[in-house]
Amino acid sequence: MDPPRTPPPSYSEVLMMDVMCGQVSPHVINDTSFVECIPPPQSRPAWNLWNNRRKTFSFLVLTGLAIAMILFIVFVLYVFHVNRQRR
């Protein structure tokens, strides 16, 4: 029985490790489409801006959903209360 070996890292994991170390390994050089997806260092601020926009957008959506839920509950309670008063 062989001892269980750890599975080899996936393609994206290797790519992320290479990008973090600032080097692109030989197996990526042939695949230029993947390299173009990685932003060059000078365009990092644009990426940060996009991430901030995404965070604000999701924050607004979640806040809107929370307010809508609260209003819906208040409306249901109000209708229930009015129906109880009529009897």
From Swiss-Prot:
GO cellular component terms given for this protein: membrane
Modified-residue entries (Phosphothreonine), positions: T6
Primary localisation category: membrane
Phosphoprotein found in the keyword field: yes
Subcellular location: Membrane
Membrane-crossing segments per the record: 59-79
UniProt KW keywords: Membrane, Phosphoprotein, Transmembrane, Transmembrane helix
DNA-binding found in the keyword field: no
Chain span(s) of sequence motif PPXY motif: 8-11
Membrane topology: Single-pass membrane protein
Domain comment (free text): Late-budding domains (L domains) are short sequence motifs essential for viral particle budding. They recruit proteins of the host ESCRT machinery (Endosomal Sorting Complex Required for Transport) or ESCRT-associated proteins. Contains one L domain: a PPXY motif which is involved in the interaction with Itch, a member of the Nedd4 family.
Physiological role: Down-regulates the TCR/CD3E complex and the transferrin receptor TFRC in host T-cells by blocking them from recycling back to the cell surface.
Quaternary assembly: Interacts with host ITCH; this interaction probably mediates ITCH degradation. Interacts probably with NEDD4.
Protein known as: U24 protein
Lineage: Viruses, Duplodnaviria, Heunggongvirae, Peploviricota, Herviviricetes
